[in-house]
Amino acid sequence: MKRSKSLGFLFVLLIGSVAVYSISSQNQKKSENTKSSAEGLIPSILLDNMGEEVSSDQLAGKYVGLYFSASWCGPCLSFTPELIRFREQHADNFEVVLVGGDGTPQDQAKYVKKYKMPWLSMVNQSKSAKQASQKLEVQYIPYLVILDPSGKVISKDGVKQVRSLKGKAMQAWKSMPKDA
């Protein structure tokens, strides 16, 4: 009888240990995924505001705002001019990449042209654009994700920060801890 209780106890202990290890392993994977979430967000080829292919290498050393937006989105239409002004004030060390949510590449091109967006864009509805949206868990637009010069996500609250802090948003991003 004692032996069967001991075996039962050992069995429960073994199952518990496996469960704890499994949960710990899953949490570590989630943590690793969060740390590397910026990897692969920006493809090597982007479009300039004329629709011509350009290298994303020109973003090197800059803070980048991934701007999730679309021509049919009222709040986007109101925020886009604010973002254009912000970008112009900080063009030396800040760039925007549009991740459009329009139905076709032609619709996105019209949107870029109408608002005279001076920045780069991902190809509309491309695999890269969809992956960035999924990886960053975009739930609504306008949505502005800020990457530091190393490509690390430092803020998913860019719209609010640009609106409330105005020109001071750049200083806030620069002062964010590098290991956060």
Model features per residue range: what roles?
Residues 43-64:
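A short beta-strand-turn-helix
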Residues 68-85:
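Conserved redox-active cysteine motifs that mediate thiol-disulfide chemistry
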Residues 1-45, 180:
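N-terminal targeting signals for export/organelle localization
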